[in-house]
């Protein structure tokens, strides 16, 4: 019997079998420190989710209680807080609208990658999966995607694959300095050129039709 809780990228996705949006935001200061915010929003499907939470299991997955969900979020918060260079960790579990949020500050971007690594190890995920998603050096911010998401996707059951068909993602990166250039041409910058945004479809990302990778050079 399968049981899924808060994992690095998709929280309760297979349990809720619902439309969702992932929002990733990084605020980078010139000194390399910054703030990270990650949201998974199921609010469009809250009626369906309320019904699912009354069940014991769905598609082989055990349905956790609301107290169990909160407990797992607390574990994630404690794990991140114990990571060197990470501070002010806050998780918010909105079980009315089903919006799950984690906020934290980092001294340098590598601290954030370390927190992802600790989270991966705590879930006993494939040790070969890279968690080095971000780098920042010499006025260059790089978002990479090294996880073989297509391969992982193909291993899923058909019913699990379906949840990604309408899923969306948004990435927002903000800086003290203005943006000189960026590699992902689907991105758009703010009028001040101190922020850049990328919207897309998760299934298109899985199939390779869209990319989340971006190399952003600052002035």
PLM feature segments, named:
Residues 1-5:
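Positively charged n-region of N-terminal signal peptides that target proteins for export
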Residues 6, 20, 46-51, 141, ...:
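Domain-level marker for long, solvent-exposed, non-transmembrane regions
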Residues 20-84:
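Start-of-domain marker
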């Amino acid at each position: 019997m399968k049981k899924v809780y808060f994992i690095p990228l998709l929280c309760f996705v297979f349990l809720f079998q619902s439309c969702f949006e992932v929002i990733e935001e990084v605020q980078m200061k010139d000194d390399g420190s910054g703030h990270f915010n990650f949201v998974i929003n199921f609010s469009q499907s809250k009626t369906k989710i309320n019904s699912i939470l009354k069940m014991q299991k769905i598609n082989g997955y055990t349905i956790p209680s609301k107290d169990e969900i909160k407990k797992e979020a607390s574990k994630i918060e404690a794990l991140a807080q114990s990571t060197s260079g990470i501070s002010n960790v806050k998780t918010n579990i909105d079980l009315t609208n089903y919006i799950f949020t984690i906020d934290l500050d980092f001294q340098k971007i590598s601290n954030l990658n370390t927190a992802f690594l600790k989270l991966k190890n705590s879930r006993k995920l494939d040790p070969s999966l890279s968690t080095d998603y971000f780098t920042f050096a010499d006025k260059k911010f790089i978002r990479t995607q090294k996880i073989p998401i297509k391969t992982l996707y193909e291993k899923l059951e058909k019913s699990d694959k379906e949840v990604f068909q309408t899923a969306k993602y948004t990435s927002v990166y903000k800086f003290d300095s203005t943006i000189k250039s960026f590699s992902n041409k689907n991105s758009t910058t703010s009028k001040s050129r101190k922020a850049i945004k990328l919207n897309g479809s998760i299934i298109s990302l899985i199939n390779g039709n869209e990319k989340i990778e971006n190399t952003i050079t600052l002035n």
